[in-house]
Curated annotation (Swiss-Prot):
Catalyzes the epimerization of 2-epi-5-epi-valiolone to 5-epi-valiolone. Involved in cetoniacytone A biosynthesis. Pfam families: Glyoxalase (PF00903). Changing H99G: Lack of activity. The lineage of its organism: Bacteria, Bacillati, Actinomycetota, Actinomycetes, Actinomycetales. This is 2-epi-5-epi-valiolone epimerase. PROSITE patterns: VOC (PS51819). Gene3D superfamilies: 2,3-Dihydroxybiphenyl 1,2-Dioxygenase, domain 1. Homodimer. Residues 11-155 form the VOC domain.
Amino acid sequence: MTGRGIPGAVAVHHVAYTVPDLDQAVEFFTEVIGAELAYTLVQDAAGDWMTRKLDVDATATARIAMLRLGPVTNLELFEYAAPDQRRQLPRNSDWGGHHLAIHVADVDAAAEYLRAQPGVRVLGDPETITDGPIAGDRWVYFATPWGMQLELINLPAGAPFEQQTEVRLYQPEGSWSDHRGAS
């Protein structure tokens, strides 16, 4: 084997989250966050397909939606019905804990907008990191009406970590609306 990584990998295609109510989540991500709905489908496979392919109960069913978030991110949402389903969201400190970070031009303005949205809970006030590898990063977490955590972030180019490595993090250009319909 030569090199590192998955042979032929060219990009991250999507991230996926399981939600308690697909309709509510799609509405939230399209109306509040600004995503675009690409498609929906229902997965109701016969036999042991769900177990073999998705490692869930064989009798599970799923409603699925794929959304586009800005110029480079696809977001897949699942609503499962399964007899052995756990119905508690992991905290960020739990194994499997997660959050989705959205780069915004103005964290304070975005947080204020979210505070006005029904059911959204902004977790404290935005703050700026003043030292370390990401000094200059301004951020705040928020929770959706069903409790999924997301983050607003603005990490300017030229962060201190860039002095130590050739690795550069993706830096968005323009607004999401600049990329509507782009592939």
